[in-house]
Structures are given as structure tokens and as C-alpha cells.
From Swiss-Prot:
Biological function: One of the primary rRNA binding proteins, it binds directly to 16S rRNA central domain where it helps coordinate assembly of the platform of the 30S subunit.
Assembly information from the UniProt record: Part of the 30S ribosomal subunit. Contacts proteins S5 and S12.
BP term (GO), one: translation
Descriptive protein name: Small ribosomal subunit protein uS8
Length: 129
């Protein structure tokens, strides 16, 4: 049994991009789907899809630019043993605004840019650059 499914997702994406895979498959969950939606909106992945009824699987299609992965770093911030919450004024800026932080808020999972626009804070799930 996995203790941190989101960290597992991020590790699968990181490892798949390092070896040049075009897609990665993993067990699906609502939070993983929401994270994949943010990654797609921000242009870090090509697309994603969910297949299966009893045990749904999330397939993420990775994105490369001139043969290099678009995602240079993807790092878990808040974890089960140490939750990291930030209010709207304390939201992190990743690489001076060139990267994103994915935030779980009361209004859903979103990028730090969108959370600032809406004036909400929340749990900092991960950082992507």
C-alpha cells in the first residue's frame, strides 16, 4: 500500500521524462486528476486520460521541447508527515514566477498564479519548473 500516492505520481512523471517516455500510466484518483489538469493548463504536459471503471488508470502524455523534457523539476512540498499551508500572501513563487506551485484550496486544486488572482491560500502540494 502506498503511503503518499501524490509523491508516487510525481516520481513516476519525473522518472518517465528522464528516460524519454512519451507517456506514463498510474492508478487514478481525484487529486491526481486535478493535479494533471493544472499541469495541462500550464503547458507542462500534452494531455491526460482516465481509463477503466473498477480500477481507473490515469495516463499522462508527457511533453518535450527540442528533445528535452518541459518539466525540469517536479518536487513534493506538503507531505503526509508535514503538511505545508500558506495563506494568499505567503504563496511561494517558483523560480521567480517561471515555475508554478500547485495549491489545494477550498476552491479546488490550482496553480499559485490562479490562487493569487482569486485571493485564496491552501496546502502547497508541489512545485514544478
Amino acid at each position: 500500500m502506498l503511503m503518499d500516492p501524490v509523491a508516487d505520481m510525481l516520481t513516476r512523471v519525473r522518472n518517465a521524462q528522464r528516460v524519454g517516455r512519451s507517456f506514463v500510466i498510474m492508478p487514478s484518483s481525484n487529486q491526481k486528476k486535478a493535479i494533471a489538469e493544472v499541469l495541462k493548463e500550464e503547458g507542462y504536459i500534452q494531455s491526460f486520460e482516465i481509463k477503466g471503471d473498477k480500477k481507473p488508470e490515469l495516463t499522462i502524455y508527457l511533453k518535450y521541447y527540442q528533445g528535452r523534457p518541459v518539466i525540469e523539476t517536479i518536487k513534493r512540498v506538503s507531505r503526509p508527515g508535514l503538511r505545508i499551508f500558506r495563506n494568499k500572501d505567503q504563496l511561494p513563487r517558483v523560480q521567480s514566477g517561471l515555475g508554478i506551485a500547485i495549491i489545494s484550496t477550498s476552491k479546488g486544486v490550482m496553480s499559485d498564479h490562479k490562487a493569487r488572482e482569486l485571493g485564496v491560500g491552501g496546502e502547497v502540494i508541489c512545485m514544478v519548473a
